[in-house]
C-alpha cells in the first residue's frame, strides 16, 4: 500500500467555556490499513514530540462495542459508513489528498470538556432515573421460568443494542435524545421483568431527558441513519406510547 497524504481540520478547545477553533494539520505517512483513531494517535505522537498539546478524544475498546468514541467527521456522526462507530472506520475509506473535518458531538446537553471530548453524563442520569429493574430476576436457569415471545425478545434485543454513544443527539438538528431514551425505555417495557416499574420508568426517564436540556424529537430520522447499532425510530414511538399510557394511568 502507498502512504496517503491527508489534510485534517480538527476542532481545538481548551475547556467548556473557552473559545474553540479549527486547526489544520497535514499528515503524509498514513497507511490505508490504519483505523481512523490510529491516524489521530499518529498525529498526537507528532504533536507531543514537537512539544505541543495532543488532541483530546475519547476511545476505549476500539472494536465498536463500548460507545466511548464518537466524532463528527465531515458533518456526519461516526463518519461516512453506515452501522459503524468511529473506531471501526479505516483510512482506506478515504483517498490520497482528502481533507477531513473533525469536530466533537455538538449539543447543549453534551458540553465540550476539551477538544473532541464531550461530557455525556446526561445519559447516565437518564438511565439512573428509570433504566433499571428492582426485581431480582434470578440466575441463568430462571430465565426459562418466565416465557417471553420470540418477537418481543427480538425487539427488546434490538433496543438493548444501544451503546449510549450519543451519535443520535449529535446528528439531530434539535439535539434530541429520543432515540437513546426510547431504546432504553423500549428494551425494558417489552420484557416481563420490566413491568413492575413500567409506568414510573417511562415518566421519569422522559422527564430527566427534558431536564437535561435535550431538544424535542421532530421525526427527522437523522438519528437512525447514523446509529452505529442501526436502532429503529420505532423505539421513539414506543417511548411516546409508554409515556402517554403512564400519564393517563396516574403513575408518578
Residue ranges and their predicted role:
Residues 23-35:
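Short, contiguous acidic and Ser/Thr-rich linear segments
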Residues 11, 28, 73-75:
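Short strand-turn-strand beta-turns centered on an Asx-Gly dipeptide
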Residues 34-53, 100-252:
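Ferredoxin-type iron-sulfur electron-transfer modules in oxidoreductases and energy-metabolism complexes
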Residues 73-95, 102:
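Glycine-rich phosphate/adenylate-binding loop and adjacent beta-alpha elements
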Residues 56-68:
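Short, structured protein-protein interaction patches enriched in aromatics and acidic/basic residues
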Residues 4-25:
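Eukaryote-biased recognition of intrinsically disordered, low-complexity regulatory segments
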Amino acid at each position: 500500500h502507498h502512504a496517503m497524504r491527508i489534510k485534517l481540520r480538527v476542532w481545538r478547545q481548551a475547556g467548556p467555556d473557552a473559545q474553540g477553533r479549527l486547526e489544520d494539520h497535514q499528515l503524509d505517512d498514513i497507511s490505508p490499513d490504519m483505523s481512523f483513531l490510529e491516524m489521530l494517535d499518529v498525529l498526537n505522537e507528532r504533536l507531543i514530540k514537537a512539544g505541543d498539546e495532543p488532541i483530546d478524544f475519547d476511545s476505549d475498546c476500539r472494536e465498536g462495542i463500548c460507545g466511548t468514541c464518537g466524532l463528527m467527521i465531515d458533518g456526519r456522526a461516526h463518519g461516512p459508513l453506515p452501522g459503524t462507530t468511529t473506531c471501526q472506520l479505516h483510512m482506506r475509506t478515504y483517498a490520497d489528498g482528502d481533507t477531513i473535518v473533525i469536530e466533537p458531538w455538538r449539543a447543549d446537553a453534551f458540553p465540550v470538556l476539551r477538544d473532541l471530548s464531550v461530557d455525556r453524563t446526561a445519559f447516565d442520569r437518564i438511565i439512573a432515573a428509570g433504566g433499571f429493574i428492582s426485581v431480582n430476576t434470578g440466575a441463568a436457569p430462571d430465565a426459562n421460568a418466565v416465557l417471553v415471545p420470540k418477537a418481543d425478545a427480538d425487539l427488546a434485543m434490538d433496543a438493548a443494542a444501544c451503546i449510549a454513544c450519543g451519535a443520535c443527539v449529535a446528528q439531530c438538528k434539535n439535539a434530541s435524545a429520543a432515540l437513546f431514551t426510547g431504546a432504553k425505555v423500549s428494551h425494558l417495557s417489552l420484557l416481563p421483568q420490566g413491568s413492575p416499574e413500567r409506568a414510573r420508568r417511562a415518566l421519569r426517564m422522559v422527564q430527566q431527558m427534558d431536564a437535561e436540556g435535550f431538544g424535542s424529537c421532530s421525526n427527522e430520522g437523522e438519528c437512525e441513519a447514523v446509529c452505529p447499532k442501526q436502532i429503529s425510530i420505532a423505539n421513539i414511538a414506543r417511548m411516546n406510547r409508554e409515556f402517554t399510557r403512564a400519564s393517563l394511568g396516574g403513575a408518578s
